Structures are given as C-alpha cells and as structure tokens.
Amino acid sequence: MKLALISPKGVGMGTNEENRWTEELYDSLSGIDSLRELMSCANSPLLTVASILESFFDEMEYIDEEIEDIDWEKQYDMVAMSFMTQQASRAFEIAGQFNEKGVYLIAGGMHPTNSPDETLQYFDTVFVGEGEITLPQFMNDYLENKPLRIYKNTHEINMDEVPLPRYDLLKMDRYRTIPLQISRGCPHNCEFCASTKVYGPKYRHKSVDRVMQEIEMIQKIKPNSHIYFTDDNMLVKKDFAIELLDALKDKKL
C-alpha cells in the first residue's frame, strides 16, 4: 500500500502565492530571513505519523504544499493530513479531490481535534488528540475492513516512547529549518490557545538525552540546519529547561 502524508498550505503561512501579504511583510523588514524559513518549516506531526505507520505501508511520500504542488496523477491507497485551522479550508479542498478518486482519507491535528464533526464531513476517519496508540488501532481495523469514523485518545503518552520522526522523507534541499517537538501539554489553559484541548493540562517532556539524540540525527541528515522547537511552552518546568539549555550549550548549539 502507498500512503501520502500531506501538509496543506495555509492562510498567512509559508511563501506560497496565496500569502503575498506575508511576502510583503518579509520584504519590508531587514534581517527577517529566519522568520521566512521558520514559516516554511516541515509538518512535525506528519513526520511522526509516518514513523507510527511505516510498518503498514510499502511506500510513503511526504508532500508539503508550501514547497511543492500535489501531483494529482499519482495513485495512493490512503492520504493522511495534520492541520491547523488556518490550513483547514485547503485541507478540505484536497480531501474533496482525493475523495473523487476513491482514496481513503484520515485527518488529525489541532483543527480536527477541536472540530471533529466538521472534519468528518470531508474525511473518512478523524483522530482526536494524540495518535501514537489510536493510529495502529485504526490500521488494524482498516485492514479488517471495519475502521471507525473517529478515534479518541484516552491515554497519556510517554514522550520518550514517541517514535523518531521520519526526517528522511523530507526534501532536505528545500528546508533550512527542521522542526523538533520535545514536550506536550500545558497547565495554563489560556483562552486563546488550543494546546490543552489537544494534549491535556499535564506537561510531559522528552528526556534531555532523547532530545540530544534527535538533534544529532537531524545534524547527520541536514548539517548546519536551524532547529525549531515546536513546543507550545517548553519552559513550564524550569529545572528541565535549564538542563536542556546546558546540554545545548555544551554541544555549542
């Protein structure tokens, strides 16, 4: 089977044609190249999904609409998307086109978790919350021709047990900034933030050794790359933050 992991372009994100105002903002500011690169960063959750599902598929392809177009001539058995609200309208458009081809569609991430009913109008299966446990459950159901329409995570995921992202799927020559998630959850439950709704109020983080392992892997795959910590709040635990920063300093990072 062949799986496409698609990161949809979004309003106000990246450097695609629809975001000309973003380009104008970049051009109006000096020394802003790092912001441009950051906004064109790869989709970290999808790379983790690829690791979780790799044993179920013969072939996987990661497609980032911020750097390339979808090749509608290619054939896939399944399409997976992870997206935020500013990407939702485009995600639904993509889903509609693949639906016409009879491709099975699955979705997760911030928007599907917070708006599952809306997302189910366009996708065959929606994942609410973290997918490390529910994704393999879904695949087993799918292979037995009895997939559910919605899977909700009810377990607390140990961050050190999260599979290493499939960075090897990236077209590395198109990226300078590589994403790295080291924690999930936040105790503050701010009204403007969806983090607690997706990951819960308990702050969970990878060990410093695990973080450094991932950084070393990124450096081997993409030397001299920028690393973007995608965490919603990586400074919740002061002792951990200091330990991590000391480790980064020791490695001259």
State each model region's role.
Residues L3-L38:
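Short glycine-rich His-centered loop
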Residues I6, S82, I106-G108, Q181, ...:
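A cross-family glycoside hydrolase active-site/sugar-binding cleft signature
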